Amino acid sequence: MDLWLREGQIEDAAMTYKIKETLVTKKTKYQELAIVDTYALGRMLVLDGIVQTTVKDEYVYHEMITHIPLFTHPNPQKVLIVGGGDGGTVREVLKHETVEKVVLCEIDEQVVYECKKYLPEISCELDNPKCEVFIGDGIKYVHQHRNEFDVIIVDSTDPFGAAEGLFGGSFYKEIYNCLTEDGIFIAQTETPFYLPEVVKQVYKDAKEIFPITRLFMAGIPTYPSGFWSFTIGSKKYDPKEVDLSSTLNINTKYYTKELHKACFVLPKFVEDLTR
């Protein structure tokens, strides 16, 4: 008998994945957690029934949410990641030699624990001496730190439940204060196909706070519609105008210097959401 995972992506649409093996399922303090091995996409982290990352395509998301801001900032030394307990963003951040410290603030310690156990390709840098794993509320952490981080990456789940407070103007104001005087913030901001109102509102909220606000897209097969948005807010540096003439000094599978520029070219219906 075949076993399938059905992910309800929106009210009227779903994706299904054929499961080879269920590695772990548990109810944590905050959510239902599962890691399964699938035939099509390899091992997969699922939270509250929603696919968060897979071994097959995780590099797209983690490279784009990391390298766009870190190559935009001329000297990123201290980085904060809110969420991202799987460790993929930490892995990509630590490819940058300028980074002296990265703080991962994850509310659910079980995500970190199980990903270290079952997703070593993604979580491989969580024990790096440059990485501090802080288990706690990202909103409170940001509020308690001022003028400290060069880059803040909000690597959150969808804007529901525990992650709902990570979307919106009040949190972005706290992020602004947590950043250094030339700091950069980035967040994953859902799909413009299914959730255009979320994309539009997040961009509007960020633009009211940051002098430079940009939206860019990436193709991520696992995520609803496969067409995903990221919003970046910067105090000083424009990611569209950054000088990338020097040789790329890190190994990537998706991000390139050319793509850094190209990803900001938006389809008209997405561009309209930024107006």
Swiss-Prot record:
Does the keyword Cell membrane belong to this entry? no
Limits of the PABS domain: 2-235
The answer on whether this UniProt entry bears the keyword Cytoplasm reads: yes
Cite a single GO BP annotation: spermidine biosynthetic process
Give the UniProt family note: Belongs to the spermidine/spermine synthase family.
What is the annotated quaternary arrangement, including any partners?
Homodimer or homotetramer.
- According to UniProt, the name of this protein is Polyamine aminopropyltransferase
Give the organism the record lists. Clostridium kluyveri (strain ATCC 8527 / DSM 555 / NBRC 12016 / NCIMB 10680 / K1)
> What does the organism's lineage look like at the top?
Bacteria, Bacillati, Bacillota, Clostridia, Eubacteriales
